């Protein structure tokens, strides 16, 4: 299966407009943003666990990274409420479930095998730090090699200078509305800016979004 699989191409998806697609596991539904492969694939997906749904033990052959968007996600190591950012390195395994139901943004098979650090962060407890420009704040989540992951906040009325994404960037809007020359992206929007692309983002009302860059190299 190939969905927005060409990493050299710009892509955008407005997930609230998508239908939920059943996975092979009962009560686990998906909105597929990008995918290159079968049931085990390099992918970016919004996954919904209905209350009581479970996913059996599985191994992360290329690593797993997720951000809990809503509800509480659980595995053998604990419970992860909304706002929790988690990285499971290549070769790790777990089973997963949600007693009350949850939604997560999950990225599979996108980690450097040399990156062996497990990460569990309560992003709500992190302080905002000054970003690259006035009106922009960041919460760094992880960095390894060329890969950088963070939350970014753009204050109302801020316009970011036109810039080039040398190594490519993905973002997922968590709150508010982001815009650029190509459109407007509300909560739940996902966008990929490929390596070498240029744009000038801004936000009239302010927004917060997840950012991952440098992982296309």
Please place each PLM-identified region on the residue numbering.
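The feature marks the first
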Residues: 28-32, 39-73
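Short acidic-glycine-tyrosine-enriched beta hairpin
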Residues: 75-93, 180-199
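Ligand-binding loop in jelly-roll beta-barrel domains
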Residues: 28, 90-114, 195-217
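A short, N-terminal "cap"/entry segment at the start of jelly-roll beta-barrel domains
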Residues: 1-39, 101-146
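Surface-exposed interaction/gating patches
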Residues: 130-175, 180
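Glycine- and acidic-residue-biased ligand/ion/polar-headgroup-sensing regions
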Residues: 51, 60-75, 156, 165-181, ...
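Fold-core signature of tandem repeat domains
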Residues: 55, 80, 86, 154, ...
């Amino acid at each position: 299966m190939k969905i927005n699989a060409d990493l050299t191409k710009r892509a955008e998806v407005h997930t609230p407009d998508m239908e939920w697609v059943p996975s092979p596991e009962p009560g686990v539904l998906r909105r597929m943003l990008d995918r290159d492969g079968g049931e085990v694939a390099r992918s970016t997906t919004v996954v919904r666990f209905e209350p009581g749904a479970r996913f059996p033990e599985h191994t992360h052959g290329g690593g797993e990274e997720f951000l809990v968007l809503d509800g509480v996600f659980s595995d053998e190591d604990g419970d992860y409420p909304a706002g929790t950012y988690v990285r499971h390195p290549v070769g790790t395994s777990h089973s997963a479930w949600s007693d009350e139901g949850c939604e997560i943004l999950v990225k599979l098979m996108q980690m450097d095998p040399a990156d062996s650090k497990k990460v569990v962060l309560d992003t709500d407890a992190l302080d905002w730090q000054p970003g690259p420009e006035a009106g922009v704040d960041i919460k760094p989540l992880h960095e390894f090699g060329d890969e950088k992951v963070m939350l970014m906040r753009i204050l109302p009325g801020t316009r970011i200078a036109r810039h080039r994404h040398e190594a490519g960037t993905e973002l997922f809007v968590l709150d508010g509305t982001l815009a650029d020359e190509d459109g407007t992206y509300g909560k739940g929007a996902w966008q990929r800016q490929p390596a070498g692309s240029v744009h000038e983002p801004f936000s009239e009302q302010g927004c917060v979004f997840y950012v991952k860059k440098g992982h296309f190299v």
